[in-house]
């Protein structure tokens, strides 16, 4: 059982994804964020996942990992991007989910591999506007860790992650932005 999963989305075909994009465009919603391209309900510090034993399931025909989400659409990413091209929309491509709030070196390596695969498969689309790192973060960038040494490690991890990930993405997709969703809680704690 995957929490927060809308069962109706599982039934959507590629054509229904295209219709959704057209409907968004009609409402002047011209920027889309694909939240994630893999589903993996694990959390930082509470798993032993690495790039070799990753068990997440893809929403697209990934060659990196065999697991697939049980959905009707064959390739909803292609359907979304091709329709967004026609509609003149921008899409932020979700690169994730390795594990929630996880910016460790292992997560970085996984993200590099997935970002490159996504670019190789979908980078020809004009609507492919940016990379969106799906893992999210608390505003303090320490993800609510209680121990000072773990708080520092989480902050160091996220800074290193984005420095390296942005440089890596620039090597094959120069100028494409990289985005992370943080919440607004405890932002002052992340300023050090």
For the regions a language model picked out, list residue spans one by one.
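Glycan-processing catalytic domains of CAZymes
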Residues: 1-192
């Amino acid at each position: 059982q995957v929490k927060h999963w809308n069962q109706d989305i599982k039934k959507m075909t590629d054509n229904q994804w295209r219709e959704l994009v057209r409907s968004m465009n009609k409402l002047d919603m011209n920027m889309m964020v694909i939240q994630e391209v893999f589903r993996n309900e694990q959390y930082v510090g509470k798993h032993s996942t690495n790039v070799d034993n990753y068990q997440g399931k893809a929403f697209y025909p990934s060659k990196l990992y065999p697991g697939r989400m049980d959905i009707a659409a064959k390739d909803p990413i292609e359907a979304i991007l091709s329709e967004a091209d026609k509609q003149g929309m921008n899409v932020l491509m979700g690169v994730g989910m390795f594990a929630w709030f996880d910016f460790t070196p292992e997560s970085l390596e996984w993200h590099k591999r997935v970002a490159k695969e996504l670019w190789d498969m979908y980078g020809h689309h004009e609507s492919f506007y940016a990379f969106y790192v799906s893992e999210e973060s608390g505003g303090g960038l320490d993800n609510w860790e209680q121990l000072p040494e773990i708080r520092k490690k989480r902050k160091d991890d996220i800074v290193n992650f984005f420095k390296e990930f942005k440089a890596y993405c620039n090597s094959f997709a120069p100028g494409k932005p990289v985005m992370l969703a943080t919440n607004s809680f405890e932002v002052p704690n992340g300023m050090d």
